[in-house]
Amino acid sequence: MDRIAQSDLSLGFGSSHALPLPHPPRIPIADDSITLQIDSSFRPSSNPMPPVPLQLLEQRFDVTGSCSRVVEEDDEVVGDNDDDDQREEEQFILLGHPMKLKRGRGGNSYSLASSSPCKRFVVDSGIESRRAVVRAWGNQSIEEADPEIHEFMEKEKQRQFRGIELIASENFVCRAVMEALGSHLTNKYSEGMPGARYYTGNQYIDQIEILCQERALAAFGLNHEKWGVNVQPYSCTSANFAVFTGLLMPGERIMGLDSPSGGHMSHGYYTPGGKKVSGASIFFESFPYKVDPRTGYIDYDKLEEKALDYRPKILICGGSSYPRDWEFPRFRHIADKCGAVLMFDMAQISGLVAAKESPNPFDYCDIVTSTTHKSLRGPRGGIIFYKRGLKPKKQSINLNHCESNIQYDFEEKINFSVFPSLQGGPHNNHIAALAIALKQAASPEYKLYMRQVKKNAKALASALISRKCKLITGGTDNHLLLWDLTPLGLTGKVYEKVCEMCHITVNKVAIFSENGVISPGGVRIGSPAMTSRGCLEPEFETMADFLYRAAQIASAAQREHGKLQKEPLKSIYHCKEIADLRNQVEAFATQFAMPAFDM
């Protein structure tokens, strides 16, 4: 039986001079239609227009106007031809559009209730099949949904498992981090900060982000009254640029370690030809300090001299390829003398800092940024720590910095710079994964792991030095080392390609030669990834032998073929020496499990 509903929805069009009319009688309608009440001022009062139903469900009418029941596509159409249910068609123009009305013959008010016996409403039989298709599509595995991508992913997994990973900025995450990254948290959008979101439904997302902030402070032993943290940046480069954008006006000055000296391009970098490479150098004025080319160490005397002349607003310490500890007291002294904010980019060594295997930057710096992967073993992203609360009474010889009761103003500026100035919604799956990694970073097991990372790097350095290899600064204080290949007549580009043929991954770097000329003859090597796979000092001594043999192969091939370009490099892929080394590397690497996978 059809369900009958009452409706007071009507659509009337009348002139401004029309007299008010009493409310027309309500017409009972079925739940598949709406009554259209045309204002009587459109027609003579002697012949009022009856209410007209607007059908919401598509119905079929035969040529004579008789009502037919609603049917499925494969249903037989059976019509009623009762005289009392037949209708007339009437055409008229409404707002410039031709319209057609159907009403009962004789001009009587047409009630849908009277026509209900000639109609039967049927649910589309295809709706469940369509729903099933959508559900099936949403539940496919990668292998089912995209075999091509699945194939590439499997090949990459095998590459990681069968090779030796020595790129200093890469690592293996744990299974819990990987599960969070691939979780349902990626579905939620959450622009803003906890408690102040643009979208609703973020009560649990807020709890996750607040917990992540608390764990970030705890991992580095920080008091929440003196330090704040933003865990939303998509990368450390984004974090660095957010600091610059929040604290500086365009064109103001920053000063960081030169890229060939081991700095990072996000600190502001120009090519030797003067091209501005990073956003920091495009929107702000940057000036580098450098290492002493004879020793490879930062020349702090020249740094102080340059800083006092240049007067940067932000002085940056930290880099991507500096193998020694940073002298934070000296940096603090220089920053105070020139009135600069002191910022440390600990992207490379944040894990060592958390494990107290490296000097603590938080005792001296105003702002600290980092990646969240690399030595932290978290997801790929960035993080910003900033001082809060009262400034020290005497922070600088600049009188403007000696007043008491002045609060740090970093928090609001940096948070606003991250969002809405530079980013949209944070990646909630990343923040949850970071919270997991930070919990692990505060554990005793993680501290043992980072201690082993440092031991392994030193063992690798000693093994290379024993083979007469030249290391920048003569060794390492952290997880990475720089190998100067110029005595072997090699460039970093050629050497990394030969290593890749042997299933060893390292990365080329530019270095300063002893005469102060920038050379592409360096390679950076790091210990975190293979430490994560369970390798200890003896295994890193074996890896040193693999690296040295790869250098000998590359040097011999270069002597035979001349300067190795792309095509000659391809030609040596199948040579016996490389094939033998590749097989030995694979046999060695596959002894050690790949974290997060049963392989």
From Swiss-Prot:
This is Serine hydroxymethyltransferase 6. Homotetramer. SUPFAM superfamilies: PLP-dependent transferases. Belongs to the SHMT family. It is found in: Cytoplasm. It catalyses: (6R)-5,10-methylene-5,6,7,8-tetrahydrofolate + glycine + H2O = (6S)-5,6,7,8-tetrahydrofolate + L-serine. It comes from the Eukaryota. The lineage of its organism: Eukaryota, Viridiplantae, Streptophyta, Embryophyta, Tracheophyta. Pfam families: SHMT. Catalyzes the interconversion of serine and glycine. The keyword Lyase does not apply. It comes from Arabidopsis thaliana (Mouse-ear cress). Its EC number is 2.1.2.1. One of its GO terms (cellular component) is cytoplasm. PROSITE patterns: SHMT. GO terms for biological process: glycine biosynthetic process from serine; tetrahydrofolate interconversion. Its cofactor is pyridoxal 5'-phosphate. Keywords: Cytoplasm, One-carbon metabolism, Pyridoxal phosphate, Transferase. Pathway: One-carbon metabolism; tetrahydrofolate interconversion. The gene is SHM6. Residues 1-25 are annotated as: Disordered. GO terms for molecular function: glycine hydroxymethyltransferase activity; pyridoxal phosphate binding. The modification N6-(pyridoxal phosphate)lysine is found at K374.
